């Protein structure tokens, strides 16, 4: 299974929320969410997370979490990330776990 697309979803009625939907070549999707500073999170997900994740196995979520947290481009003043990255990574992580549950037929 490979990640084919990462979609961000926003709703004007819940303007601080961002949902992240990860699509795979097997038609299985995973949904995650995060809160606060939605425009920055959407930019981070599409500009940083998506290029890293596209084409990768979504079930290697521990590897992806570690790489996104410690990715050199995400370092700021010597620290791994800032709050936007933590929130974006959290939404990605939730979506990957959701995808794992769905691919395992867990309900």
Segments (PLM) and residue ranges:
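Metal- or metallocofactor-binding catalytic centers and their adjacent structured scaffolds
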Residues: 23-103, 107
């Amino acid at each position: 299974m490979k990640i084919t697309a990462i979609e961000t979803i926003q709703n004007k009625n819940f303007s601080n929320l961002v949902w992240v939907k990860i699509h795979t070549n097997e038609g299985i999707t995973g949904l995650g969410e995060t809160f606060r500073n939605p425009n920055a999170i959407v930019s981070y997900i599409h500009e940083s997370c998506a290029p890293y994740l596209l084409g990768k196995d979504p079930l290697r979520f521990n590897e992806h979490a570690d790489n996104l947290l410690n990715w050199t481009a995400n370092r700021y003043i010597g620290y791994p990330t800032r709050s936007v990255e933590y929130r974006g990574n959290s939404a990605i992580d939730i979506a990957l776990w959701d995808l794992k549950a769905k691919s395992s037929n867990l309900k």
